[in-house]
């Protein structure tokens, strides 16, 4: 079965370098749910083995689903992982449509860590028109904007507010930043869960 891989690095808000140095270490955890008792989420991870993460009482769950270019509409808040083109535009590798409650997350234009020279643009869709090589989208953010070409082979994903009831055994989940506490335990306030064939990373 075809699986859609959802990458999330650099889609979240950046933290100032000085403040980051003072923060406790974090761990990225991705895998399948083994169990969830309402507080402790047990995950089987290929990279980390069996991991248990304590979820905070207000932990948010976001469902990640496959979307289409038709969902990329003016006003939508998106994140675009792309490669720069010779004409100054960005050719999208992956587009993420954020839930409305996530509007403003990671806003701006910066390097992406998915592959060498790749970029990340988070902002609001200002306009979208059909182009020769794909849909041409203007993404506006505070202080600037980027012209993005979304080719037919770009991965397009959508985030929606989910519920802890989705954290069932076998569900594919990803925690981008699980806080590693002094006693070695992990704690998180957000979980991404794949819907359909999407596998969050």
Can you say where each PLM-predicted feature lies in the sequence?
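Short, flexible, surface-exposed loop segments at domain boundaries
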Residues: 4, 17-201
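Bacterial N-terminal signal peptides
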Residues: 6-16
């Amino acid at each position: 079965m075809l699986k859609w891989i959802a990458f999330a690095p650099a889609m979240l808000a950046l933290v100032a370098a000085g403040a980051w140095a003072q923060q406790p270490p974090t761990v990225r955890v991705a895998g399948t749910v083994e169990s969830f008792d309402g507080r402790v989420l047990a995950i089987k991870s290929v990279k980390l083995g069996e991991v248990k993460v304590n979820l905070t009482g207000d932990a948010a769950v976001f469902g990640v689903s496959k979307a289409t270019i038709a969902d990329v509409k003016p006003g939508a808040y998106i994140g675009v992982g792309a490669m720069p083109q010779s004409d100054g535009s960005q050719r999208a590798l992956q587009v993420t449509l954020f839930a409305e409650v996530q509007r403003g997350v990671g806003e701006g234009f910066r390097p992406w860590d998915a592959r060498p020279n790749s970029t990340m643009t988070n902002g609001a869709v200002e306009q979208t028109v059909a182009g020769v090589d794909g849909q041409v989208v203007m993404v506006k953010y505070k202080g600037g904007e980027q012209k993005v070409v979304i080719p037919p082979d770009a991965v397009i994903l959508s985030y929606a507010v989910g519920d802890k009831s989705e954290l069932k055994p076998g569900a594919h989940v990803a925690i981008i930043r699980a806080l590693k506490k002094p006693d070695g335990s992990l704690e998180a306030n957000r979980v991404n869960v794949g819907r359909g064939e999407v596998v969050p990373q």
